[in-house]
Structures are given as C-alpha cells and as structure tokens.
Amino acid sequence: MSDRIILCDVAPRDGIQNEKIMLSSAQKLELIRRLAAAGMRWIEVASFASPKWVPQMADAEEVFRAASQIPGIRPIVLVLNDRGYDRAVAAGARYIRLVVAATDTMNQKNANALPDATMAAYRPIFDRARRDGVELTGTIATSFGCPFEGAVDPDRVLRLAAQFVAAGVAEVDFADTVGMAVPPQIERMLVRARNEFPSVRIGIHLHNTRNLGLANAYAAVRAGADVLDASTGGAGGCPFAPKATGNIPMDDLVFMLEGMGIKTGVDLDKLVETSRWFEEILEHPLPAMLPKAGPCWNSPPPLA
C-alpha cells in the first residue's frame, strides 16, 4: 500500500450530470475553484457529451476553457465518441477519459453500441491522441456488476482493459457504476490488473448505492490503486443506469485516507466548506457524513 494516492474529484461532471437544477457556467466554475483552493489537483471538469442526452454539460467548452486557466489543477474531461473528442481537443483538453461498459446492455444504453463496436470506434481516437499529445484514460463501466445483466465476468472486464493498454492509454479505471461491488471483488480485480498491466496507472471509480463505497475504497487502496475518483458531498449518478446513486463522498474519503496515514494534500476544512456550499447550490442535502459530523481530530491519529 502506498502512503500517497492520487485523488480525482468528479463533482463538476459526474456529480452534477443527473441534477434537475441546471447549474450556470459560473456556478460550475466556482465549484472547480473551491475544489482547487481546497487542494484538489485532479478534477473532472466536464463531459463533451451530446447536450441532447446530457443537457447539464451543454456549456462544456466554456467551462473547460475557464477551468484550464486555474493554476495547479489537471482539468480532465470525458468523451464518448469522435465528435466529443473533436470538441474537447478544440477547446484545449489534454487529459481525456474514454468510457466503455463491460456489458452489452449497459453499453447499448450509454453509447447505442456493443462494447466491441465502441472499442473499434475508439481506434481513430487512439491514433489521433498520440499525434495530438493527449493523455488518455480508459474507463470500464459496470466492471463489478450491471443493473441489467447482473454479475460481470472479471475476465471480460480485463479483456477490455487489455485493449485499452495495447492502444496506449496511461490509465485504466474500473467503475462500479451502480455500487454492486463488495471489497473482495475490488481487491481481486485490482490485484489482477496491477499484475497484468504494470505499465499504466490503475484507477477506481466507486458509487455508494449499497453503502459499501468507503469499504471498497479501502480495499482498492490496499490492493495498490493509484487513482481514486470521488465526488465532493457524494453528489452524482449515471443518467443511463437505474438506481445509480452518488459517488463516494470525497470529504469522507479524505478523512479515511488521512486517518490511515496517507497524505492527500487536501485541506479538509475547505473541502467541507465546499461541500456545504454545494448543497446550497443544488438545493438538497448531499450524502457525505463529514460535513454533518465534522472531523474527530485536528491532526491524523497515531496508527501505532
């Protein structure tokens, strides 16, 4: 287990894409600025998806261009196809996530194609990214379970991961899209991924649908994950997956990691302030517990 881990806050993208209240560009940028001020360095700032399907992301270009001027952050974006890639690169994006679902039904819902067809459609993007100097991450949705098909064969997931690695991505992320995983699943998958793909970063994207998000994050850290996604306040959900609730709360995750002796570089007080502000903007409570209970120590407790 490393004493350091990369955290990526997905609140400005995954955290708001399902919200009924349409946030203004100014509000999205204020969220990103607050996260940066709290010490978040990797931030997923937008998705270049069709505004028809994800209207919350209609201002992706404006938000990205402004976010890219904030010092000290890595502004990451999500794209689903070559049109999204074109828009992202034209806006100046250099860190792009691609996503494919491990199951046929989920990928049909998300991309209107089977997983193999989506991977084939990504081939021109892989080639262009090398020429454009763009760093790619391959994200595999429903890696641990699917709301339509149930259990997912890990071999199927790792075959998709192998295709991403062969195409030259810098990172592979395994997503528990609807919170179906339990800690032993997480550990087994990530240990295999670490052994099979030593040349790339291994990331995990967790949802807390069944209240196992932090337990799964703990398992991921113990298994050697390099990158953990989370969302300030625990906001989020997938518009194409029924009953998908929020991401694991970044607030609670940072509290856990710091208590484990893992340095995050995040100012927890500022992050909690941001979470409370975010609740006001969204006009409903968020599931993070730390903003409600507060930290129980002023510095990380001794582990001995």
Show the residue positions of the predicted features.
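Catalytic cores and adjacent flexible loops of soluble metabolic enzymes
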Residues: 1-304
